[in-house]
């Protein structure tokens, strides 16, 4: 019975509800849905998540990617998320009255942006405490509505719906603040929330605390223009043509905010106006390159990576090369990601155990990484637009790399100990902050070239030299080389000019290389970045991972290479400054460029210039902490030459001014004068080379030591600069830029060559003018004792044309003229020195023959040596004139360039038949760069030596002739030689030339008598290496020859090459050893040709001057250990 009333009550309530539901079924359903939606936001946190998923961002007016939220949570854990879910800025239901702020249409509309004159931000924070009270109130009102309905049998749903209306103002607390305002919000759950209003360029944000400081949570834009707007780079704030209504400062053309052309100034003018150096050279070039890159990668409407957010969702990105490639690669990248997901799924299915969680995390991070940096992440899933994507290359990679090039180099550039050209303390606009590096470079180049003379002179006298004692109208930063150019120009001595200009030319050359290398690095980064959609997906698979690693390594290398070059320049500058300026310190002064105002017709210029000058305030302990620093600066060559009058004045003032004053008290004259060190130094003392006053000697010594230091520095830096590109590439494990950029020594070498040519021309003109006519020309070509002065030998009986193309007995002196007959000369085998006489032959042969004197012994000439002495039939030449010519040419070896490289052709003649000719088809690199080309040149030289050995062996065995002898038998030596030679011909290394059957040599062979042929046949197997004043023959490792009277000594070459050279050092050592071998062979051949090098000397042999010189050179090689003689004749096979 106790349960009966309770059961009846439950049955009545259920029947009431069911009946009520049948009556108002549709109305109840809508009301229940509204209640369920409201109950899903039981707390401020759950309500914030619901708003984030179902509506637009309510916490900010500026849309941000989800990736940003994840990053911010790492920077500010817990605090950021709690503030993020409770903050409300973009909510029209809240901000529509005076309490929260009246913003018709919503707080985030264009018309309701923050006024820059009153930068106040309105926002609200959700309170869980008030939310609990509001929800309790709704439950109470719903219960009352149900009770009312039960008693009155009315419809309760309208009352329930009204009770559960989302009254946001009941549980939100309004705030307002300007930049700098902060406070705390207290609540249930997470008890304290710290907030602060900050300004970030053209936006006002509500922030909270994080590891890196204030972390923005929700932001709102300010109206433009305002003093520090990011749009100042694109529009002229003072130009009213862009403003439709001056009262609200609204631009009439919104695209003007992101249009580079609206500014009215090009890239050059922008960089020039932002530069702080007096002479602007490099920064406009870099700025134009950066703008070109921004237009190429982002859009034609932007000039900087700082404004990429302005065109993210615009169709103007269609002009971007990177964007077009990304669109084209979209399906390919999607295919890569699909394959990666499939492979990972197969791995999970086929694995015997569950993979660790780290693999799942790695899987997800790889997909996000590849998508973000290859084609971009779609920030709006409901929108399929290609323009609405987050691109990691544009937002992170390119700004980091391109700004990092200048940033890293700028750290090094401003590390100069003297304080010269330091621009890091000057404030630049953020968009052009990189110009500090190029201002420092321009300042350095202008300083060392003396281009900043006028500007420094103006600031020197305007800001520092106000009194007469310190006034120096000759004070300017002219470099010391100026004082060498003046006497060089007056005296005409080009050596002084070369010495004076060597350092500034090296500075220009290295600076040009730095600018060129930086530009090439920027362009290379752009090319690699555009290919990111191709290389980034290769990160997914182990098989293609190496391609991605190489791509990243190249990007980092191009980032670091300019820093390495700048480090070298700073080292060069610092050593030079210390050598010339000692411990002098520089001060700077920022002045307005009034000169440009006058040049522009009185229009006021906005550009300020930073001027540097030597600080001669010796009492400034911040820069000169001790007296040694002061004395080092005063006694430096640079300071004395830059400040000549000031130096002389201070010297006289410190040492003489007190002497003129009256002597104090009863002090004796000797005691009074003993206080002045200047007078005690006037006495004569020993100098470096002669007696001189001590004071004068000290000054000369300082100058001399400074010059030695500067020259030594120049020598070191010059040699190191030749390998600067390779050094930078090796340090960064990248590609050297010397093949695509100007070489560090290019300008220096070109200028030095021009100066050398100018000096040679000046010297030649002076000699011709002093000696007159032909004598000067004859001395210039080194042909003394000849009959005529005709340099080209185009007329006359005998000319001075010296053709150094063969050379055995003497130089091949080709004489042409109207009275002479074309001649060809052949040598004899009778002696080591051929004596010649003239003989005329008919037109069928048309050659001159040098016939031998009578001799009982015939020694055949070595076949690899071609000795021709063409002479004329002119009766004006005596029989001894040829010997005199040979002797004069030997004495003037330095004037006649007869030390050419190893010949690529060998043209030889034989007593019996003419030798064939051949050409060597392999060609070395003229200016080898890199290990590969150096190694190829070494291989070509080795191949040339092999060819020459094979050719000499072929000729020595009786082969290699156009027409063989009738009675000649083919020996085994000749067969082997011909086989080896044919291998070179078949491989294409050499090409034979046999089209000389009717040559002079073969016609001469038909004219020779039988007795000569029999003598040659008798001695055809004897090899006699005759080297008669010929430096053009190819090197041999050994020369084992015999003479009829005494055998030659044997020797061994003691230097050994690396078998498999690795690295530049071993390749260079091998090249040096080969050069040393050539030098040894030249010395040996000269020794043998002069009659030396025998085991037993010939009886009655006379030692000539030539032999004495040859033996001296050979003995030096023996003493140095390069070669070792074997005079016991045990190893000489021919003795």
Swiss-Prot record:
Q: Which GO terms describe its cellular component?
A: plasma membrane
Could you say which residues form the signal peptide? 1-28
Task: Tell me the keywords, alphabetical order.
Answer: Cell membrane, Membrane, Signal, Transmembrane, Transmembrane helix
Output the superkingdom of the source species: Bacteria
The residue ranges crossing the membrane are: 332-352, 359-379, 393-413, 495-515, 522-542, 555-575, 700-720
The membrane topology term of the UniProt record is: Multi-pass membrane protein
Its primary localisation, in coarse terms, equals membrane
The cross-references to InterPro entries, in alphabetical order and at most eight, read:
Conjugal_tfr_TrbL/VirB6
Tell me where it resides.
Cell membrane
Q: Which GO terms describe its biological process?
A: protein secretion by the type IV secretion system
Q: Which family does it belong to?
A: Belongs to the TrbL/VirB6 family.
What this protein is called in its record is: Uncharacterized protein RT0032
Organism listed in the record = Rickettsia typhi (strain ATCC VR-144 / Wilmington)
């Amino acid at each position: 019975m106790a349960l009966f009333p309770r059961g009846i009550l439950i049955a009545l309530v259920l029947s009431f509800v069911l009946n009520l539901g049948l009556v108002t079924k549709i109305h109840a359903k809508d009301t229940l849905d509204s209640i369920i939606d409201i109950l899903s936001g039981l707390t401020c946190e759950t309500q914030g998540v619901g708003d984030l998923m179902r509506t637009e961002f309510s916490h900010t007016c500026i849309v941000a990617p989800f990736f940003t939220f994840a990053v911010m949570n790492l920077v500010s854990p817990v605090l950021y998320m709690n503030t993020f879910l409770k903050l409300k800025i973009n909510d029209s239901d809240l901000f529509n009255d005076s309490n929260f702020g009246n913003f018709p249409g919503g707080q985030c509309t264009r018309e309701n942006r923050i006024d820059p004159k009153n930068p106040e931000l309105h926002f609200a924070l959700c309170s869980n405490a008030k939310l609990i009270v509001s929800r309790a109130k709704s439950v109470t009102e719903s219960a009352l509505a149900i009770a009312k309905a039960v008693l009155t049998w009315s419809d309760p749903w309208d009352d329930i719906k009204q009770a559960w209306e989302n009254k946001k103002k009941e549980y939100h607390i309004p705030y307002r603040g300007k930049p700098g305002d902060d406070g705390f919000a207290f609540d249930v759950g997470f008890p304290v929330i710290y907030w602060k209003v900050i300004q970030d360029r053209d936006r006002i944000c509500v922030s909270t605390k994080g590891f890196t400081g204030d972390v923005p949570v929700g932001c709102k834009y300010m109206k433009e223009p305002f003093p520090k707007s990011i749009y100042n780079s694109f529009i002229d704030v003072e130009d009213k043509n862009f403003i439709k209504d001056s009262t609200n400062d609204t631009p009439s053309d919104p695209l003007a905010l992101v249009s580079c052309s609206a500014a009215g100034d090009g890239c050059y003018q922008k960089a020039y106006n932002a530069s702080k150096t007096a002479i602007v050279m490099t920064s406009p070039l870099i700025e134009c390159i950066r703008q070109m890159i921004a237009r190429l990668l982002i859009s034609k409407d932007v000039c900087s990576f700082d404004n990429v957010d302005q065109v993210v969702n615009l169709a103007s990105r269609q002009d971007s090369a990177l964007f077009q490639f990304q669109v084209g690669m979209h399906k390919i990248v999607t295919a890569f990601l699909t394959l990666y997901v499939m492979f990972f799924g197969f791995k999970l299915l086929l694995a015997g155990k569950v993979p660790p969680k780290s693999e799942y995390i790695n899987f997800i991070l790889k997909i996000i990484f590849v998508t973000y940096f290859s084609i971009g992440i779609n920030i709006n899933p409901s929108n399929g637009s290609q323009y609405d994507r987050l691109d990691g290359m544009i937002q992170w990679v390119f700004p980091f790399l391109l700004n990092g090039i200048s940033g890293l180099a700028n750290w090094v550039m401003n590390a100069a100990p003297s304080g010269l050209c330091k621009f890091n303390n000057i404030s630049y606009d953020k968009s052009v902050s990189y110009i500090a590096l190029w201002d420092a470079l321009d300042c350095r180049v202008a300083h060392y070239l003396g281009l900043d003379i006028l500007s420094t002179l103006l600031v020197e006298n305007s800001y520092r030299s106000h009194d007469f004692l310190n006034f120096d109208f000759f004070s300017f930063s002219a470099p010391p080389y100026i004082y060498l150019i003046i006497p060089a120009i007056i005296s005409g001595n080009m050596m002084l000019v070369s010495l004076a200009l060597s350092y500034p030319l090296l500075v220009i050359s290295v600076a040009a290389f730095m600018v060129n290398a930086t530009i090439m690095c920027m362009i290379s980064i752009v090319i690699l970045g555009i290919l990111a959609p191709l290389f980034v997906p290769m990160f997914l698979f182990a098989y293609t991972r190496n391609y991605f690693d190489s791509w990243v390594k190249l990007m980092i290398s191009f980032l670091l290479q300019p820093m390495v070059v700048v480090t070298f320049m700073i080292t060069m500058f610092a050593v030079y400054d210390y050598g010339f300026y000692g411990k002098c310190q520089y001060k700077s002064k920022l002045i307005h460029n009034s000169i440009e105002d006058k040049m522009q017709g009185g229009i006021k210029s906005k550009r300020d210039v930073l001027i540097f000058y030597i600080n001669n305030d010796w009492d400034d302990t911040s820069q000169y902490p001790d007296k040694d620093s002061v004395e080092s600066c005063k006694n430096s060559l640079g300071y004395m030459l830059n400040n000549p009058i000031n130096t002389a004045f201070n010297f006289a003032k410190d040492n003489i001014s007190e002497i003129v004053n009256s002597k104090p008290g009863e002090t004796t004259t000797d005691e009074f004068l003993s206080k002045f060190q200047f007078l005690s130094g006037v006495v004569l003392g020993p100098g470096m080379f002669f007696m001189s006053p001590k004071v004068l000697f000290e000054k000369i010594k300082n100058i001399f030591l400074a010059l030695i230091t500067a020259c030594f520095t120049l020598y070191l830096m010059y040699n190191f600069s030749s390998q600067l590109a390779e050094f930078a590439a090796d340090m960064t494990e990248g590609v050297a830029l010397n093949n695509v950029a100007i070489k560090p020594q290019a300008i220096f070498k070109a200028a030095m060559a021009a100066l050398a040519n100018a000096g040679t021309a000046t010297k030649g003109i002076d000699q011709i003018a002093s000696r007159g006519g032909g004598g000067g020309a004859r001395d210039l070509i080194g042909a003394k004792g000849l009959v005529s002065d005709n340099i080209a030998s185009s007329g006359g009986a005998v000319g001075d044309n010296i053709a150094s193309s063969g050379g055995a007995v003497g130089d091949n002196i080709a004489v042409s003229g109207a009275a002479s007959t074309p001649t060809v000369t052949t040598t004899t085998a009778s002696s080591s020195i051929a004596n010649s006489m003239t003989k005329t032959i008919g037109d069928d042969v048309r050659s001159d023959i040098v016939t031998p004197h009578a001799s009982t012994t015939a020694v055949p000439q070595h076949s690899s040596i071609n000795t021709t002495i063409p002479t004329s039939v002119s009766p004006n030449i005596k029989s001894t004139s040829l010997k005199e010519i040979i002797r004069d040419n030997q004495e003037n070896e330095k004037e006649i360039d007869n030390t050419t490289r190893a010949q690529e052709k060998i043209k030889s003649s034989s007593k019996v038949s003419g030798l064939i000719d051949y050409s060597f088809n392999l060609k070395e690199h003229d200016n080898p760069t890199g290990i590969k080309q150096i190694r190829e040149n070494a291989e070509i030289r080795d191949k040339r030596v092999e060819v020459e050995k094979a050719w000499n062996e072929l000729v020595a065995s009786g082969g290699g002739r156009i027409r063989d002898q009738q009675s000649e038998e083919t020996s085994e030596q000749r067969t082997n030689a011909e086989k080896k030679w044919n291998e070179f011909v078949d491989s294409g290394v050499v090409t034979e030339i046999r089209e000389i059957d009717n040559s002079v040599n073969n016609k001469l062979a038909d004219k020779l008598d039988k007795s000569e042929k029999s003598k040659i046949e008798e001695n055809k197997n004897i090899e006699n290496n005759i080297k008669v004043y010929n430096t053009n023959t190819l090197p041999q490792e050994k020369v084992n020859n015999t003479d009829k009277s005494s055998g030659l000594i044997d020797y061994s070459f003691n230097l050994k090459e690396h078998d498999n050279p690795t690295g530049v050092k071993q390749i260079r050592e091998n090249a040096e050893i080969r050069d040393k071998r050539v030098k040894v062979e030249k010395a040996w051949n000269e020794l043998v040709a002069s009659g030396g090098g025998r085991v037993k000397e010939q009886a009655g042999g006379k030692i000539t001057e030539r032999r004495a010189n040859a033996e001296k050179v050979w003995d030096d090689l023996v003493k140095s250990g390069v070669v070792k003689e074997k005079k016991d004749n045990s190893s000489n096979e021919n003795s």
